[in-house]
Amino acid sequence: MSNSAIFKVRLKRTRKNKNLTQEQLAEAVGLGVRTIGRYEQGSSFPNERVLHELAEVLKVKTDWLSAKN
């Protein structure tokens, strides 16, 4: 499985485990809901800054979320 495929699964699963909606996550990191949706669908991948913010809000390590481990 590619890093982007792992990322989309981990992002969605972690967001749901934290009981956050796409809207809540988007607001917390200053993105649009559509952007979060594209990340979770695997049609887009965040830049390093956004990846770090997502990991911080979700309380996970950036490397784990991005599947760089």
Residue ranges and their predicted role:
Residues 16, 27, 56:
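Alpha-helical residues within the helix-turn-helix
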Residues 1-2, 56, 66-69:
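Short, charged recognition helix plus adjacent turn
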Residues 1-17:
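A short, Lys/Arg-rich alpha-helix, primarily the initiator
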Residues 47-64:
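DNA major-groove recognition helix of helix-turn-helix/homeodomain DNA-binding modules
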Residues 19-38:
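Short alpha-helical DNA-recognition segment
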